[in-house]
Swiss-Prot record:
Cofactor(s), by name: Mg(2+); Mn(2+)
Protein name per its UniProtKB record: D-alanine--D-alanine ligase
Top class in the EC scheme: ligase
Source organism of this protein record: Enterococcus hirae (strain ATCC 9790 / DSM 20160 / JCM 8729 / LMG 6399 / NBRC 3181 / NCIMB 6459 / NCDO 1258 / NCTC 12367 / WDCM 00089 / R)
Chain sites annotated for binding ATP: 169-224
The UniProt record lists the keyword tRNA-binding: no
Alphabetic keyword roster: ATP-binding, Cell shape, Cell wall biogenesis/degradation, Cytoplasm, Ligase, Magnesium, Manganese, Metal-binding, Nucleotide-binding, Peptidoglycan synthesis
Binding site for Mg(2+) 2: E308, N310
InterPro entries in the cross-refs: ATP-grasp (IPR011761), ATP_grasp_subdomain_1 (IPR013815), D-Ala_lig_Van_CS (IPR000291), D_ala_D_ala (IPR005905), Dala_Dala_lig_C (IPR011095), Dala_Dala_lig_N (IPR011127), PreATP-grasp_dom_sf (IPR016185)
Length: 358
């Protein structure tokens, strides 16, 4: 069977995607699979690379080069294709794409239009989980605790910034955290200790999205639970992100590696059971399939607040998701195998729904 690996992408998380793809390629069982590389450049070109039958030697091999004219010429490692050309029989797509145009439902909708099986969550789940404001509305209705927050639209802020500042300061206390509504890997997030910093933080967030969310800052540990499955959902014991930085931003995650992971997290039994329960509720309410990682805040009073649910968590060497499953006895290669089977099962189920409506 062939796996079509989509990676790169136009989002700010392009480089993270390449790192994740390299790790996935080193975990796949090549005895059973061939892997077709499809690299999406930062400019949006889809570049078809070689068909791999063994592990790549370097992640630099994944940065495919191509002739801008689109011709197949010597000296280049790939060729530009139309996105629809990825459709093949006997293949499943693994979209190792993070952020907008990757895990926000757009690529999932495209793959469903092509009628291709793929790994991970569907269109609606991906779109809702990627949007921090929508996620909070849904999970609030489901009774999953979250920190206090204020959604802020860019046009509202531009029309009357004082009203927005008053609204935030009337509902929240400093420090506050400001985030783009649609972005991952902590891109565009900043901490505000006063009104001036809040203004700067909103300006930064609006560089990535026209919608932002302002959250109450709290003193808390950060624990994460991995979720796997379609209808039959399994969770891991939580792991903890141990930081030596003010907050877990993009550079801390992927550039400076200023974090450590404690797996499993040292928390009371009732805390990890509650985290697993909330993770299952969140996953189910959002219609999850395949995989997700649920991130929580844990206060010194053992209060849990769900921060976010990632439908395509990082798969790099520093990433929590595969490490959490490894701690549960599921090897990286076996995890990939399960994800592929879950994607096939979901596709077959969806085909059955179409046939039932004919």
């Amino acid at each position: 069977m062939k796996i079509t690996l989509l990676y790169g992408g136009r989002s700010a998380e392009h480089d993270v995607s390449v790192l994740s793809a390299f790790s996935v390629l080193n975990a796949i069982y090549y005895t059973y699979y061939q892997v077709q590389l499809i690299f999406i450049s930062k400019e949006g070109q889809w570049v078809k690379g070689p068909l791999l039958t063994e592990k790549p030697t370097s992640k630099e091999d994944l940065h495919l080069t191509w002739d801008p004219s689109g011709k197949v010429t010597d000296g280049f490692t790939g060729r530009v294709i139309n996105p629809g050309e990825i459709k093949e029989e006997g293949t499943i797509v693994f979209p190792v794409l993070h952020g907008p145009n990757g895990e926000d439902g757009t690529i999932q909708g495209f793959l469903e239009t092509l009628n291709l099986p793929y790994v991970g969550a569907g269109v609606l789940t991906s779109a809702c989980a990627m949007d921090k404001i929508m996620t909070k509305y849904i999970l609030q209705a489901a009774g999953v605790p979250q920190v206090p927050y204020v959604p802020v639209l860019k046009n509202q802020w531009k029309e009357n910034p004082k009203k927005i500042f008053d609204q935030c300061e009337g509902s929240l206390l400093y420090p506050m955290f400001v985030k783009p509504a649609n972005m991952g890997s902590s891109v565009g997030i900043s901490k505000a200790e006063n009104r001036e910093e809040l203004q700067n933080a909103l300006a930064l967030a609006y560089q990535y999205d026209s919608r932002a969310i302002v959250e109450q800052g709290i003193e808390a540990r950060e624990i994460e639970v991995a979720v796997l499955g379609n209808e039959d959902v399994r969770t891991t014991l939580p792991g903890e992100v141990v930081k030596d930085v003010a907050f877990y931003d993009y550079d801390a995650k992927y550039i400076n590696n200023k974090i450590e992971m404690q797996i499993p997290a040292e928390v009371p039994e009732e805390v990890y059971q509650k985290a697993q329960e909330y993770a299952k509720i969140a996953y189910t309410m959002l219609g999850g399939s395949g995989l997700s990682r649920c991130d929580f805040f844990l206060t010194n009073k053992n209060e849990l607040f769900l921060n976010e649910l990632n439908t395509m968590p990082g798969f790099t060497q520093f990433s929590m998701y595969p490490l959490l499953w490894e701690n549960m006895g599921l090897k990286y290669g076996d995890l990939i195998e399960e994800l592929i089977q879950l994607g096939i099962n979901r596709f077959n189920q969806r085909q059955g729904f179409f046939e039932a409506n004919e």
